[in-house]
Amino acid sequence: METSNRKLDHLRITLLEDVEAGDTWLDFVKVPHRAVPELNLEEVVTEIEVFGKKLSAPLIVTGMTGGNEHAAKINAVIAEVVEELGLGMGVGSQRAAVERPELEWTFRIARERAPNALLIANLGAPQLLKGYGLEEIKKAIDMIDADAIAIHLNAAQESFQPEGDVDYKGLLNKLSELVDKVEKPIIIKETGAGLDYESVKALRELGIKAFDVSGSGGTSWVRVEMYRAREKGDEVLATVADWMSSWGIPTAASIMEARAAAPDALVIASGGIRDGLHAVKSLALGADLVGVALPALKAAYEGKEELKKFLKSMMLSIKIGLFLTGSPAPEHIKGKAIVLGPLKEWALERGIYEEWLRAR
């Protein structure tokens, strides 16, 4: 199937169907309340700098869409709002536009509507193993004048696509050839199944300095592919996708894994971040930045004001969360999370708990 048509399928399904599965485990994260915060709420600072761009809060809309007219309209709405609020955004995979230049405008519109915002380009890891190199990466970056590029990992999703790219052999070698040659920072981004300690450590050793965990508990791209398989009459593939739709590392655990493996890296918490409390807990776990996708996509589909209301609510939640923990700025809330139940058991069984304590 042509890439742009597949992306249209994905957009339609994520907007209309129940595509969430798994559990973020953020319910097993507690952040102690500071009864005497010794702060003035109005003086709490939420601004941070990421890739040379100042953000008014540690919050971005992570990439989900592009490559067709409907996606372009959504990207335009998101771009206008993040520009107005001083936030950032990523676009969905740009493969379709790299291969068909007439689709570039569906992504470029993001920079046109957000001339000053942090923008993150996006290409898939499997394409790097099928011939993509510096030329295609540069094309994706230049297309939206991006400040960074996400290389997304989606082995789980690809496993359930009849046309899926399931050869990941040699990816580390390929990335090692590119990491020092790409002009902009590279973000390694999962897509709903979470980043693990071993992968992050290996990637950090290559020189990668930014990771978007995109853990389980939010949008399940396996579940999205389940709907596509049903529509095509492939009941075997649909059944297996249904069984495995909750596959992945819960977002809270993935934040801990990434932070333990790469104490000095930028860690973006995403995957099932649905409200401001989730954002505060993610920052307390050790994330530098919080990413939202599906709720922002659905709000943008309703219109600019709906998205603005959602993002402003997230921003205010973060500010109040910092205040209530005695944290004058985002970096001060790191290390204040207490992890309980299966999340702590996971960290102990995985042998990352002590490293996480030191790194957060």
From Swiss-Prot:
<feature type="binding site">
    <location>
        <begin position="293"/>
        <end position="294"/>
    </location>
    <ligand>
        <name>FMN</name>
    </ligand>
</feature>
<feature type="binding site">
    <location>
        <position position="219"/>
    </location>
    <ligand>
        <name>FMN</name>
    </ligand>
</feature>
<feature type="binding site">
    <location>
        <begin position="6"/>
        <end position="7"/>
    </location>
    <ligand>
        <name>substrate</name>
    </ligand>
</feature>
<keyword id="KW-0460">Magnesium</keyword>
<keyword id="KW-0479">Metal-binding</keyword>
<dbReference type="GO" id="GO:0070402">
    <property type="term" value="F:NADPH binding"/>
</dbReference>
<comment type="similarity">
    <text>Belongs to the IPP isomerase type 2 family.</text>
</comment>
<feature type="binding site">
    <location>
        <position position="214"/>
    </location>
    <ligand>
        <name>FMN</name>
    </ligand>
</feature>
<feature type="binding site">
    <location>
        <position position="122"/>
    </location>
    <ligand>
        <name>FMN</name>
    </ligand>
</feature>
<keyword id="KW-0414">Isoprene biosynthesis</keyword>
<keyword id="KW-0521">NADP</keyword>
<comment type="subunit">
    <text>Homooctamer. Dimer of tetramers.</text>
</comment>
<dbReference type="GO" id="GO:0005737">
    <property type="term" value="C:cytoplasm"/>
</dbReference>
<feature type="binding site">
    <location>
        <position position="93"/>
    </location>
    <ligand>
        <name>FMN</name>
    </ligand>
</feature>
<dbReference type="GO" id="GO:0010181">
    <property type="term" value="F:FMN binding"/>
</dbReference>
<keyword id="KW-0288">FMN</keyword>
<feature type="binding site">
    <location>
        <begin position="63"/>
        <end position="65"/>
    </location>
    <ligand>
        <name>FMN</name>
    </ligand>
</feature>
<feature type="binding site">
    <location>
        <position position="189"/>
    </location>
    <ligand>
        <name>FMN</name>
    </ligand>
</feature>
<dbReference type="GO" id="GO:0004452">
    <property type="term" value="F:isopentenyl-diphosphate delta-isomerase activity"/>
</dbReference>
<feature type="binding site">
    <location>
        <begin position="272"/>
        <end position="274"/>
    </location>
    <ligand>
        <name>FMN</name>
    </ligand>
</feature>
<dbReference type="Pfam" id="PF01070">
    <property type="entry name" value="FMN_dh"/>
</dbReference>
<dbReference type="GO" id="GO:0008299">
    <property type="term" value="P:isoprenoid biosynthetic process"/>
</dbReference>
<dbReference type="InterPro" id="IPR011179">
    <property type="entry name" value="IPdP_isomerase"/>
</dbReference>
<dbReference type="GO" id="GO:0016491">
    <property type="term" value="F:oxidoreductase activity"/>
</dbReference>
<dbReference type="GO" id="GO:0000287">
    <property type="term" value="F:magnesium ion binding"/>
</dbReference>
<feature type="binding site">
    <location>
        <begin position="93"/>
        <end position="95"/>
    </location>
    <ligand>
        <name>substrate</name>
    </ligand>
</feature>
<feature type="binding site">
    <location>
        <position position="158"/>
    </location>
    <ligand>
        <name>Mg(2+)</name>
    </ligand>
</feature>
<keyword id="KW-0285">Flavoprotein</keyword>
<dbReference type="InterPro" id="IPR000262">
    <property type="entry name" value="FMN-dep_DH"/>
</dbReference>
<keyword id="KW-0963">Cytoplasm</keyword>
<feature type="binding site">
    <location>
        <position position="157"/>
    </location>
    <ligand>
        <name>substrate</name>
    </ligand>
</feature>
<protein>
    <recommendedName>
        <fullName>Isopentenyl-diphosphate delta-isomerase</fullName>
        <ecNumber>5.3.3.2</ecNumber>
    </recommendedName>
</protein>
<comment type="function">
    <text>Involved in the biosynthesis of isoprenoids. Catalyzes the 1,3-allylic rearrangement of the homoallylic substrate isopentenyl (IPP) to its allylic isomer, dimethylallyl diphosphate (DMAPP).</text>
</comment>
<dbReference type="InterPro" id="IPR013785">
    <property type="entry name" value="Aldolase_TIM"/>
</dbReference>
<keyword id="KW-0413">Isomerase</keyword>
<feature type="binding site">
    <location>
        <position position="62"/>
    </location>
    <ligand>
        <name>FMN</name>
    </ligand>
</feature>
